[in-house]
């Protein structure tokens, strides 16, 4: 780690501690100023826009920032208004913090728009260095023209922010994309820093001895996440295993849709909504299989991501069923930590469940072993070290 003492960290809720990144920052910086920005309306979460001030890992004070409640139907339409508000609040409070603290060493974010705000703060002398940890790429392709326009505009910020003082990528696919379109030279070297895993006790219980097969999902409830694949295969699953449960942790724009699907299904489904802290671990560790079956649509941003949900499943020794749209899918399959399926193959999901449940202990141990490779304390230091 370097000698930096203070950091501004900006992220969208509920991703502030994905891969234990907030924990790492709190462990390594004396003064931490976290801007949590709301994008989706999440049930069970009252405040979306918050500035949290930490000193020596302890929360000192929180400030509620301006909150614009928006129906899920109008999220993308009103992005410009929300973005202007976000811009003004980060600029104002960061400048105020600079006056109080005299020096702010690092501005760190995972979003292209907020990374651009960081470059402005550096230009006016508020912060010393900027770090952009690139989590995603939003293909400017979508059936909704408004969404397509917003993605195009976001991509312009992404190209600018790709020249922050420090740029790291969660996978090589994101870096190669920028090389292919000429943002970087072909021989440019940038660190690949995946989403990290936690080091949790391994408490595997052989799920084959349980009569109920329990699936788990954690994340934002959007149709693109493939949450409904369990409902789509309910009849076959019930015929094969007799009793099926589904634990769903999280909230999001399509939550009502999934709740309706659950009502029409004979599967026992429990929605937990957004859970504070890490209480979701207690829910997930009961589950036999983690769901990460992203729909392979060309407009799905998950093609370029490194989903934190998968790293969470692995940290708990939970085998994963995922689709082959992630770069990380190859590693899941090679390590025997789960099964990768073709989303549109009608038999693939049930066959994958059979395969995992037939050797659940083995798959579970492989998942936990893979998680050790990505322990967050091992992989994050290179992102914050300036040479």
Which stretches of residues belong to each language-model region?
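Membrane-proximal helix-turn-helix segments that form the acceptor-binding/catalytic region
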Residues: 94-103, 116, 120-124, 132, ...
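A short, active-site helix/loop in glycosyltransferases that binds the activated sugar's phosphate group
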Residues: 160-190, 197-199, 330-331
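Conserved donor-binding/catalytic core segment of Leloir-type glycosyltransferases
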Residues: 168, 197, 201, 207-225, ...
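Nucleotide-activated donor-binding/catalytic signature segment of Leloir-type glycosyltransferases, i.e.
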Residues: 256-284, 289
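Acidic donor-binding loop of glycosyltransferase active sites
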Residues: 284-303, 318
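A charged, aromatic-enriched C-terminal amphipathic alpha-helix characteristic of glycosyltransferases
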Residues: 344-345, 358-386
């Amino acid at each position: 780690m370097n000698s930096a003492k203070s950091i501004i960290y900006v992220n969208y809720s509920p991703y502030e501690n994905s891969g234990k990144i907030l924990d790492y920052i709190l462990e390594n910086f004396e003064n931490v100023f976290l801007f949590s920005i709301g994008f989706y309306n999440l049930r069970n979460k009252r405040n979306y826009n918050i500035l949290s001030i930490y000193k020596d890992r302890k929360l000192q004070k929180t400030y509620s920032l301006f909150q614009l409640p928006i129906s899920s139907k109008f999220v993308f339409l009103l992005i410009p208004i929300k973005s202007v508000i976000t811009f003004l609040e980060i600029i104002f409070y960061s400048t105020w913090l600079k006056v109080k603290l005299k020096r702010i060493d690092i501005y760190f974010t995972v979003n292209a728009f907020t990374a651009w705000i960081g470059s402005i703060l550096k230009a006016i002398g508020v912060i010393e260095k900027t770090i952009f940890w690139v989590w995603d790429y939003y293909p400017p392709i979508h059936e909704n023209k408004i969404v397509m326009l917003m993605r195009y505009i976001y991509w312009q910020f992404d190209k600018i922010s790709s020249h922050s003082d420090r740029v790291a990528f969660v996978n090589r696919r994101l870096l190669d994309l920028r090389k292919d379109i000429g943002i970087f030279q072909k021989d440019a070297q940038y660190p690949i820093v995946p989403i990290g895993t936690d080091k949790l006790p391994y408490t595997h219980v052989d799920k084959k001895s349980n009569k109920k097969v329990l699936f788990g999902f954690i994340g934002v409830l959007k149709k693109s996440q493939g949450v409904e694949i369990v409902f789509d295969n309910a009849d076959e699953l019930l015929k094969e295993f007799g009793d099926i449960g589904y634990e769903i942790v999280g909230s999001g724009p399509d939550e009502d849709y999934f709740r309706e699907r659950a009502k029409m299904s004979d599967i026992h489904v429990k929605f937990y909504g957004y859970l504070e802290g890490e209480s979701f671990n207690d829910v997930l560790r009961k589950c036999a299989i983690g769901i990460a079956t992203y729909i392979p649509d060309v407009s799905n941003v998950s093609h370029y991501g490194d989903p934190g949900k998968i790293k969470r499943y692995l940290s708990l020794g939970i085998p994963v069923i995922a689709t082959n749209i992630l770069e990380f899918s190859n590693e899941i399959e090679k390590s025997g930590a789960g099964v990768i399926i073709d989303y549109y193959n009608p038999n693939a999901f049930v066959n994958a469940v059979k395969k995992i449940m037939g050797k659940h202990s083995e798959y579970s141990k492989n998942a936990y072993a893979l998680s050790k490779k990505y322990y967050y304390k091992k992989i994050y230091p290179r992102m914050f070290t300036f040479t």
